[in-house]
Amino acid sequence: ETDGKRSRTSYTRYQTLELEKEFHFNRYLTRRRRIEIANNLCLNERQIKIWFQNRRMKWKKDSKLKIKDSL
């Protein structure tokens, strides 16, 4: 049933903080930067890529909500 499905990654506070900090300066990463971050945080490239994809979607959703609230 769960063949091939990865378990959900839980990030440490430090990892989340570092990822958020990076996102604040840049919403998109180059491959080189993604590799650097992955090495620094002991995560793999795919985890970084997916975290940024998810974070961009959250940012987009939050932006839409802010606009709606200001009307």
Swiss-Prot record:
Subcellular location: Nucleus
SUPFAM superfamilies linked: Homeodomain-like
Keyword set, alphabetical order: Developmental protein, DNA-binding, Homeobox, Nucleus, Transcription, Transcription regulation
A molecular-function term among this protein's GO annotations: RNA polymerase II cis-regulatory region sequence-specific DNA binding
Name of this protein: Homeobox protein Hox-C5
Biological processes annotated in GO: anterior/posterior pattern specification
Disulphide-bonded residues: none
Gene3D superfamilies, alphabetized: Homeodomain-like
Function (record text): Sequence-specific transcription factor which is part of a developmental regulatory system that provides cells with specific positional identities on the anterior-posterior axis.
Keyword check for Nucleus: yes
Lineage, top ranks: Eukaryota, Metazoa, Chordata, Craniata, Vertebrata
GO cellular component, one term: nucleus
Pfam families: Homeodomain
PANTHER family recorded: HOMEOBOX PROTEIN HOX, HOMEOBOX PROTEIN HOX-A5
InterPro entries: Antp_homeobox (IPR050296), HD (IPR001356), HD_metazoa (IPR020479), Homeobox_CS (IPR017970), Homeodomain-like_sf (IPR009057)
Superkingdom assignment: Eukaryota
Ranges of the DNA-binding region feature: 4-63
Protein family membership: Belongs to the Antp homeobox family.
